[in-house]
Structure formats: structure tokens, C-alpha cells
Amino acid sequence: MASPRTRKVLKEVRAQDENNVCFECGAFNPQWVSVTYGIWICLECSGRHRGLGVHLSFVRSVTMDKWKDIELEKMKAGGNAKFREFLEAQDDYEPSWSLQDKYSSRAAALFRDKVATLAEGKEWSLESSPAQNWTPPQPKTLQFTAHRPAGQPQNVTTSGDKAFEDWLNDDLGSYQGAQENRYVGFGNTVPPQKREDDFLNSAMSSLYSGWSSFTTGASKFASAAKEGATKFGSQASQKASELGHSLNENVLKPAQEKVKEGRIFDDVSSGVSQLASKVQGVGSKGWRDVTTFFSGKAEDTSDRPLEGHSYQNSSGDNSQNSTIDQSFWETFGSAEPPKAKSPSSDSWTCADASTGRRSSDSWDIWGSGSASNNKNSNSDGWESWEGASGEGRAKATKKAAPSTAADEGWDNQNW
């Protein structure tokens, strides 16, 4: 890249000798120069000058290339106006020259020698210049044009070295291309040509990328499955150990202790005996209920609940009925103290077991006045209700007075 000193010198030179326009086409603000002649050219013309070869035109960039002091001196010695005036002053100059003819002419060779001599600080004269004997090449047919397609063969006859001409042709073909490629190398790259195998390469690359993605996902899935299986196995083993420990503590150890102490058979025998007693009690009670239902007899007093559990006191208040020895109907309206009766004395039709006679509460003696003479009759008959004397009623009332719980028999039925 040009140094600040180089930029300063070139800025001063540009302001002189019509250097602010292109020497070839007249474009404004040229950024390229031909150091050999000290002239300023544009970007397009710089490519054409490169095609001439460095022995005819050495091209440099004003801002992008590094400069030497001798090159700056050549720029001061040359210039657009100086070169044009020098060419027009020569006898062999023709305005219709092509670019190749112009810079291959004797006039151009003389000006090159002048610029190089002045840059070295020497005096130059036309008579003493070695370029006086310059003999330009004489081609049979001149095919050089400003825009020759790349790769077009050149039909020129050379008077110099054949190898040099071959190098010149190769250099010209590399720099002077077609119109669409003339900016190649200056920020504009030509896209590569598509080949037939590009499609296959792109397909294979897509296949490789897809397979890589699949393998990556499969490896991730396998690692996740492995981690899950390991975690599940650890949890299962932990639960199994906990279950085994609980079973050992709650079942096996107590059983072992009982076996050692000899208590396990006692526990088994006690459990079996309890179960048998419960089964026996349930079976006997069920059979007794069935036989009672079909025989029409009342339940035996031996199977009845204790006193205080009569149907008059079925509300369950045992504390109030604990002192009552007789049922309510046995003392209601009776003149004499009640006597003990057989278990079947509650029946209306059964005979009295103690006397061998029918019970006094039978319907056969309903309304009879001889209730007082029947001493062995049951006191809860209907005849006692009608035939009892006032004294009997008073005694019954007096007897029933202390037992307040018996008078409230109807109130305890929760009817």
C-alpha cells in the first residue's frame, strides 16, 4: 500500500500536465499509471497496458502498490501532456496507430529513454540517445486490436528472439481477455464452470450429511436408553432390597424368635380354638333360631339375655332396669306378689308346667270371676285385670310405685 509520502508526491504530480484524466480514453480521476512513460490511465486502459508487457509499459496502482523513489522520479519526469507533445513531434508518428503500434514505435522508445535518463538525474539529448537505432518489429499482418478475444492466435513476424515473442503473446493473452472478463483480478472473480459431476457430488455430500445426522441421533438415543436402563435397574434393586429388609424384619425374624421360644405352636393352637368356638357358637345359634321358627315356641329363657333386656326395655338402657326383677306385665294389676313361672309361661295357650293346668291367661276363662281362687294361675291374665280387688290394685300400685323405671316401659320403646 502506498505510503503517505508517496501519496503526497503523486497528488502533486496529478495536478500537472493534464494528469487528472486518462491518457488513452480521457476518463476523469485515473487511479493507475504507466511508470515507463509517467502517464496516468484508468482501470480499463491499465489492463490493456498490462497486455503490452512490462518491457513496453510497467503499470502501477496509485493507492494499492508500493512505490520506489526511482519510480516517483519517473512520474515527475513524464506526464500526459509531455508524452503527447513528444509523439506528435516525431516524424514517424501516426494518429491512427493501434495501442501495440504506438508503444512499439521508435518515438515511444525515445521517450522511454528520456524519462529513464532524467529520473537518474542525467542530461538527455536526442542525438546521443541509444534509442535512435530502435527498429520496431515488422509483422506481416497486424491483428492487434483494442479488444481482441482471449486465446486468439497472433500472426506476426518477429525480427528478434522467438522465445521473447512467445512470452509476449502469453502475457497478452493472460491480461487482455474478453469484454466480460476484463475486470478479473480487481475484485471481480469469474464463477467456475459447472461440471457434470457437480450434481453427483452435491447428492453424495447431502447423503453423507444425512447419515452423519442419523448416526449422531442414534448415538444420543442409545446413550439415553442406557442411562434410563441403568437408573431403572438401580431403583429396582433398591426397592427389592427394601422389600427384603421389611419382610425379614416383620415376618421372618418374629417367626424365628417364636420358633426358638416354642410359642409358634401355642399361637396356632389358640387361633384354631378361637376359630372353632366362634364357628360352634354361630352354628348353634343358627340352628336354635331355625327350630324356634318352625316350632312356634318362644326362645328358651336360658338363651335369653339377662334381666333388663326384655322387649319393654329394648332401648338398651341397662342402668335404669338393673333393679327390675319382674316384667311390666307380671306386676300390672296383680294382687299378690308374682311367682316364678316356667320358661313357657309367656305363651297364651301353653299349660302351666308347675301345676299341670292351663295358664290363667287363656282365652277360655275370659271374663270369669274366679280369678282370685286360681292361685297358681299366671298373674298377667286378663281376668286379673277385671277381678282384682281394690286392695290388690292398691298393692300393685304401691309395689309399682318404687319402680319408676317399670312404669316408663312404654316410654322406653321409642315408638
Curated annotation (Swiss-Prot):
Task: Give the residue ranges for region: Disordered.
Answer: 126-161, 295-415
Q: What is known of its domains?
A: The region downstream of Arf-GAP domain is essential to GAP activity in vivo. This region may be required for its targeting to Golgi membranes.
InterPro entries with a match to the protein in the record: ARFGAP/RecO, ArfGAP_dom, ArfGAP_dom_sf
Q: Is Phosphoprotein a UniProt keyword of this protein? A: yes
What happens on changing residue 22 to A?
A: Loss of GAP activity
Q: Which CDD domains match?
A: ArfGap_ArfGap1
PANTHER family per record:
ADP-RIBOSYLATION FACTOR GTPASE-ACTIVATING PROTEIN 1 (PTHR46395:SF1)
Residues that bear Phosphoserine: 246, 342, 345, 347, 360, 362, 379
The protein's location, in the record's own words, is: Cytoplasm; Golgi apparatus
- What gene name does this entry carry? Arfgap1
Q: Where is the composition biased (Polar residues)?
A: 126-144, 310-329
- What protein is this chain from? ADP-ribosylation factor GTPase-activating protein 1
**How is the subunit organization of this protein annotated in UniProt?**
Interacts with ARF1. Interacts with the COPI coat proteins, KDELR1 and TMED2. It is probably a component of the COPI coat protein complex. The interaction with TMED2 inhibits the GAP activity.
**N6-acetyllysine modifications at:** 231
State its role. Answer: GTPase-activating protein (GAP) for the ADP ribosylation factor 1 (ARF1). Involved in membrane trafficking and /or vesicle transport. Promotes hydrolysis of the ARF1-bound GTP and thus, is required for the dissociation of coat proteins from Golgi-derived membranes and vesicles, a prerequisite for vesicle's fusion with target compartment. Probably regulates ARF1-mediated transport via its interaction with the KDELR proteins and TMED2. Overexpression induces the redistribution of the entire Golgi complex to the endoplasmic reticulum, as when ARF1 is deactivated.
> What domain of life does the UniProt record list for this protein's source?
Eukaryota
Write out the entry's keywords from A to Z. Acetylation, Cytoplasm, ER-Golgi transport, Golgi apparatus, GTPase activation, Metal-binding, Phosphoprotein, Protein transport, Transport, Zinc, Zinc-finger
One GO MF term on file is: GTPase activator activity
Zinc finger intervals, C4-type = 22-45
Keyword Methyltransferase listed: no
State a GO cellular component annotated for this protein: Golgi membrane
